[in-house]
Amino acid sequence: MSARFEGSYLGDATRLADDAVLECKICWQRYDPAEGDPVWQIPPGTPFAALPAHWRCPRCDGDREQFMVVDG
């Protein structure tokens, strides 16, 4: 059983606001939908839940489940 952190994304898009800012719990890289992700060529305005399945943290290559909600 893996450890769960309060606020972790864990793939549950139904509980995530479109403007929610998330942070990687490995390296603290933030994903802000207002900014998108230039490394992965994700345009501004793209909610975290709408990121492609292959998207990973641009800093540490952690998967989406390593992100937790910090605002939203």
From Swiss-Prot:
What would you give as a GO molecular function for this chain, any one? Answer: iron ion binding
Q: How is the cofactor bound?
A: Binds 1 Fe(3+) ion per subunit.
Q: Tell me the domain of life.
A: Bacteria
Necessary cofactors: Fe(3+)
GO terms for biological process? Answer: alkane catabolic process
Alphabetical UniProt keywords? Electron transport, Iron, Metal-binding, Transport
InterPro entries per UniProt: Rubredoxin-like_dom, Rubredoxin_dom, Rubredoxin_ET, Rubredoxin_Fe_BS
Residues that coordinate or bind Fe cation: 24, 27, 57, 60
Pfam families assigned? Rubredoxin
- Any idea where the Rubredoxin-like domain is? 19-72
Briefly, what is this protein's role?
Answer: Rubredoxin is a small nonheme, iron protein lacking acid-labile sulfide. Its single Fe, chelated to 4 Cys, functions as an electron acceptor and may also stabilize the conformation of the molecule. Could be involved in hydrogenase-linked redox processes.
The similarity comment for this entry is: Belongs to the rubredoxin family.
Q: Can you name this protein?
A: Rubredoxin
Task: Identify the species of origin.
Answer: Azotobacter vinelandii
